């Protein structure tokens, strides 16, 4: 090989190495930014809804999915930085699904050096026995799992139960209840458990599913698929998820507005007579902040600006 070719090859190798170094730097930067964003969003949700207080013992429900892994990881980070003291115990419910790799979670949790508990309960057989083939198992599975987790929380002395539901889950539940249950009802970030003994929290309430997916890849979490319910096709939740994904693609910002609307509810402008005292409403002679003036200030009512995805009415409609 001539000296010129050798010089060219060396220069090319140096250029490739420099590009590779820059790419790696960018990846590290983006991954660090993702971690900071998740910590900020989880911390904000905890603060906004007073999810965790000094002296709490938080039972983190770990399913082996990307979301619960992310939840545990971020809570462990925040615990080190928080101005308050709280304990974490990770709990997995082994439902005895066929081919469930029951060695993965114990091995992972031992590496973290945190308290954990594996609860063995054969809910899989119960669900398969009671639910006809082809029918959705989610509802019964959820009820059985919930009851077991409440009992385990009692046994472990945990007063808070942390679940890995994220922002997308909350919006999907909102539309599921609206479309199929005729209710304006979502998935609250904090609520009292059915038995009245615990507070259930969802610290990922502000976190997008896309971020937990990416974070799982970055952290290389040992994901365990759910063969009981996750593999079922044509679930209503999947239809809603597809609808929201399509909206986000066609009309950027719409899904963000929907999520924001869940925190800016005006009961006087809905139709729930239990939520607002329509029957007792009287004219007081004083202007009301949420009166008809609210309709005059709608941002979408100015000029002829069209709303993406909405067909405007003709004058004679």
From Swiss-Prot:
The UniProt catalytic activity note for this protein reads: cytidine(32) in tRNA + S-sulfanyl-L-cysteinyl-[cysteine desulfurase] + AH2 + ATP = 2-thiocytidine(32) in tRNA + L-cysteinyl-[cysteine desulfurase] + A + AMP + diphosphate + H(+)
Q: Which cofactor does it need?
A: Mg(2+); [4Fe-4S] cluster
Q: Which UniProt keywords apply?
A: 4Fe-4S, ATP-binding, Cytoplasm, Iron, Iron-sulfur, Magnesium, Metal-binding, Nucleotide-binding, RNA-binding, Transferase, tRNA processing, tRNA-binding
Q: Could you provide one GO biological process annotation from this protein's UniProt record?
A: tRNA thio-modification
Instruction: Spell out the InterPro entries in the cross-references.
Output: Rossmann-like_a/b/a_fold, TilS/TtcA_N, tRNA_Cyd_32_2_STrfase, tRNA_thiolation_TtcA_Ctu1
One Pfam family of this protein, by short name? ATP_bind_3
EC number per UniProt: 2.8.1.-
Q: Which GO terms describe its molecular function?
A: 4 iron, 4 sulfur cluster binding; ATP binding; magnesium ion binding; sulfurtransferase activity; tRNA binding
Q: How does it assemble?
A: Homodimer.
List, alphabetically, the NCBIfam families matched: PRK10696.1
Q: What is this protein called?
A: tRNA-cytidine(32) 2-sulfurtransferase
Which organism's genome codes for this protein? Janthinobacterium sp. (strain Marseille)
Query: What is the name of the gene encoding this protein?
Result: ttcA
């Amino acid at each position: 090989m001539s000296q010129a070719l050798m010089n060219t090859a060396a220069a090319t190798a140096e250029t490739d190495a420099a590009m590779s170094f820059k790419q790696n730097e960018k990846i590290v930067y983006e991954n660090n930014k993702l971690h900071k964003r998740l910590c900020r969003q989880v911390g904000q949700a905890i603060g906004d809804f007073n999810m965790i207080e000094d002296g709490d013992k938080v039972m983190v429900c770990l399913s082996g999915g990307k979301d619960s892994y992310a939840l545990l990881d971020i809570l462990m980070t925040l615990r080190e930085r928080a101005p308050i003291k709280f304990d974490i115990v990770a709990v997995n419910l082994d439902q005895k699904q066929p081919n469930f790799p029951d060695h993965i979670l114990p091995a992972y949790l031992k590496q973290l050096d945190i308290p954990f508990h594996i609860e063995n309960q054969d809910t899989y057989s119960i669900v398969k026995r009671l639910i006809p083939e082809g029918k959705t198992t989610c509802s019964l599975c959820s009820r059985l799992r919930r009851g077991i987790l409440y009992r385990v929380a009692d046994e472990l002395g945990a007063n808070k139960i942390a679940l890995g539901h994220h922002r997308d889950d909350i919006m999907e539940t909102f539309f599921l209840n609206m479309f199929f249950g005729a209710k304006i009802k979502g998935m609250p970030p904090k609520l009292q458990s059915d038995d009245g003994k615990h507070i259930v929290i969802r610290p990922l309430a502000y976190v997008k599913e896309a971020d937990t997916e990416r974070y799982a890849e970055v952290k290389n979490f040992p994901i365990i698929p759910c063969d009981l319910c996750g593999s079922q096709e044509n679930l209503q939740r999947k239809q809603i998820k597809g609808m929201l994904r399509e909206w986000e693609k066609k009309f950027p910002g719409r899904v963000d507005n929907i999520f924001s609307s869940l925190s800016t509810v005006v009961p006087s402008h809905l139709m729930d007579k239990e939520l607002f005292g329509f029957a007792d409403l009287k004219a007081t002679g004083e202007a009301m902040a949420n009166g008809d003036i609210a309709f005059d200030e709608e941002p979408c009512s100015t000029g002829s600006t069209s709303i993406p995805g909405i067909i405007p009415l003709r004058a004679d409609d």
